[in-house]
Regions:
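Buried hydrophobic positions in well-ordered alpha/beta secondary-structure cores of metabolic enzymes
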Residues: 6-8, 34, 63, 74-77, ...
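Short, flexible, mixed-charge acidic loops at enzyme active sites
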Residues: 22-24, 28, 89-97, 192
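Hydrophobic pocket-lining "lid/loop/helix" segments that shape and contact the acyl-thioester
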Residues: 57, 61-64, 156-216
């Protein structure tokens, strides 16, 4: 029986850091209030010229070096994110292009905080089925661009970054099993109120339209 194992890991955090002391200057909060309730002392924030795919690439390069694999070895890319560069093409294909990875299955999953868990579970099943030999799995967010910096209940919680692993086949158990689940009745506990079919015009992006090179 074929199992999957993590062959390499990598992470990337933007250089800019906002400490709790910095947050005290932005909203009515304190370092003590944040730490005692969340354990958070600081968070990293992407620069304006950084995209989620950039964070993914930086984390992926480290993971690939750690695993000793090259771009041509990758035959599956799965990324968990709710803050992609674009609605489409999906961010996995953008990362694929930036890293020079040859044609392979590449897709992203939108499951918020559990995105990386869903991504690694999906890649694990590809490997167990014998469809994949070397998977690049990434969880990444530039979530600070969705934050209300005047809402102290949320803005102190989130930061930007990316983590990546290389998943490979193994005769011995690496990932033993995964169990996925969701309960939609709690959908209003944490959400972003704008989507393509909901409130798009109200968000001020109604002039954005699909672009296509029709002859290609």
């Amino acid at each position: 029986m074929t199992f999957s194992r993590i062959g390499g890991t990598g992470r990337y955090l933007p250089e800019r850091v906002l400490t709790n002391a910095d947050m005290e200057k932005i909203v009515d909060t304190t370092d003590e209030w944040i730490r005692t309730r969340t354990g958070i002392e600081e968070r990293h924030v992407a620069t304006d010229d950084e995209q989620t795919s950039d964070l993914c690439v930086d984390a992926a390069k480290i993971a690939m070096a750690d695993a000793g694999v090259d771009p041509q070895d990758i035959d599956l890319i799965v990324i968990g994110t709710t803050s992609p560069d674009l609605l489409f093409p999906n961010v996995a294909t953008i990362v694929q292009h930036k890293m020079g990875i040859p044609a392979c299955a590449a897709f992203s999953l939108e499951t918020a905080c559990s995105g990386f868990i869903y991504a690694i579970s999906t890649a694990d099943k590809f490997i167990r089925a014998g469809d994949t030999k070397c998977a690049l799995v990434i969880g990444a967010e530039i979530i600070t661009r969705l934050i209300d910096w005047e809402d102290r209940n949320t803005c102190v919680l989130f930061g930007d970054g990316a983590g990546a692993v290389i998943l490979q086949p193994s005769e011995e158990q690496g990932i033993m099993s995964t169990h996925l689940g969701a309960d939609g009745q709690y959908k209003d506990l944490l959400y972003y109120p704008v989507g393509v079919s909901n409130n798009l015009a109200a968000a001020g992006v109604g002039d954005s339209r699909i672009m296509m090179a029709g002859n290609e």
